Amino acid sequence: MSLVACECLPSPGLEPEPCSRARSQAHVYLEQIRNRVALGVPDMTKRDYLVDAATQIRLALERDVSEDYEAAFNHYQNGVDVLLRGIHVDPNKERREAVKLKITKYLRRAEEIFNCHLQRPLSSGASPSAGFSSLRLRPIRTLSSAVEQLRGCRVVGVIEKVQLVQDPATGGTFVVKSLPRCHMVSRERLTIIPHGVPYMTKLLRYFVSEDSIFLHLEHVQGGTLWSHLLSQAHSRHSGLSSGSTQERMKAQLNPHLNLLTPARLPSGHAPGQDRIALEPPRTSPNLLLAGEAPSTRPQREAEGEPTARTSTSGSSDLPKAPGGHLHLQARRAGQNSDAGPPRGLTWVPEGAGPVLGGCGRGMDQSCLSADGAGRGCGRATWSVREEQVKQWAAEMLVALEALHEQGVLCRDLHPGNLLLDQAGHIRLTYFGQWSEVEPQCCGEAVDNLYSAPEVGGISELTEACDWWSFGSLLYELLTGMALSQSHPSGIQAHTQLQLPEWLSRPAASLLTELLQFEPTRRLGMGEGGVSKLKSHPFFSTIQWSKLVG
């Protein structure tokens, strides 16, 4: 297959050269179109050239993310051609300057695509697919859709730093999470779009704009596991002191549906903010390219997956949603819910069987969770049967194993990433990897010991960092106390893990083997790998084949 640059030369007098000289020819072409400002078309209007350029750039972005680099290169060329012809006759000086900046950016990206992805197969004789990343996951890229399809959708809620959106055609709701594109594709970081991961939120579609990748994700309505546990403790405490027998029976019969009372959405939204904001304000208010809209855009994040939580820190600058009720936990940091457990609550577990209980964290302003999954000075109690924790742990393990098999590391798995569906099963928020999205870790996940000690350092991360996070989450579920609370000075190479005496021996053994300071010594690494982790006595009653099925 010949290179696009060989087929689409701008000047009719030039003859195509052999593909062996494709790289030099591409550079010649790019240099030519940089100097073609004088070759304008007199009758081209402002509206025509911006609309035509937007069409070409949108197609280039879609093909770029889908890793169809030859088509992307072609569309970038066409888009730049249109802009160069139009800028010559555009009377608006401010708009001309903005267009020049766009041209520079598109030329830079076209050259990067050629140098990184197109020259290698042609010059080395390799197959055209030889430099394309993540080929085994290419079928999932059929989920890519035109970003304009999002424009008709209505924002009905804001859940932390993602948007709850309604499809006007079906009336169904889904979650939209935006990831900022850095426009510098990493050669080392491949694009990996996981699919078929059990116990993880499903990616339904994704959309590409000039500056962002928008993930269209399944809406898991159960809220976070941590909010469920805290509300259960509160409802049981309330049931002991007040409430009808019928209400207490209902809570016992529906343990997985007894979630926090839906919170009212923020008020004071401005007109026009009930639509998805696809782009930030532009350099020039008159310049709209690639489906851009001059409106406030969602907070952009780099990693994690979304239905009720995200895995990056920072405050949200999302547009406020229309008033109404959101039927899942949507409380922001610093806002209290009537259903939240009171500070200082002490609840004595009752009933037969091994029951685990302890002191957990209360409400606090944290990037991890607004429902108690971050640092907190308040103390709340929950109790969970070890068998139930074992089931949730097995579901988390299966999800992490599948992500690792597809080449994805979570790095900062924390309570905000653990959702609970209406059947009571764990659902991880969505994790993926994009060559154009710079990975970031939640700083508070590191500070609160949810992330492994090596995260944020200079050493290359392995699956071991997720097994630490897995152990940290299990520590909190089993003991009721966060790892950072029981180890306020952190965990070093010679730190002795603090475990309550009442913890079962298999549970204590599992936590000790997972929370090893040295990554290579953690359970799940080295000889035996994940199989050794699955065969640990703590999971002796788990039927793994049925769990995956």
UniProtKB/Swiss-Prot annotation:
Its EC number is 2.7.11.1. ATP binds at R151, G152, C153, R154, V155, V156, G157, V158, I159, K177. Keywords: ATP-binding, Kinase, Nucleotide-binding, Ribonucleoprotein, Ribosomal protein, Serine/threonine-protein kinase, Transferase. Transmembrane segments: none annotated. The active site is at D412. GO terms for cellular component: ribonucleoprotein complex; ribosome. Pfam families: MIT (PF04212), Pkinase (PF00069). It is an enzyme of class 2 (transferase). Residues 87-115 form the MIT domain. Residues 145-539 form the Protein kinase domain. It comes from the Eukaryota. Residues 260-325, 330-349 are annotated as: Disordered. One of its GO terms (molecular function) is protein serine kinase activity. It catalyses: L-seryl-[protein] + ATP = O-phospho-L-seryl-[protein] + ADP + H(+); L-threonyl-[protein] + ATP = O-phospho-L-threonyl-[protein] + ADP + H(+). Belongs to the protein kinase superfamily. Ser/Thr protein kinase family. S6 kinase subfamily. PANTHER family: RIBOSOMAL PROTEIN S6 KINASE, RIBOSOMAL PROTEIN S6 KINASE-LIKE 1. This is Ribosomal protein S6 kinase-like 1. The lineage of its organism: Eukaryota, Metazoa, Chordata, Craniata, Vertebrata.
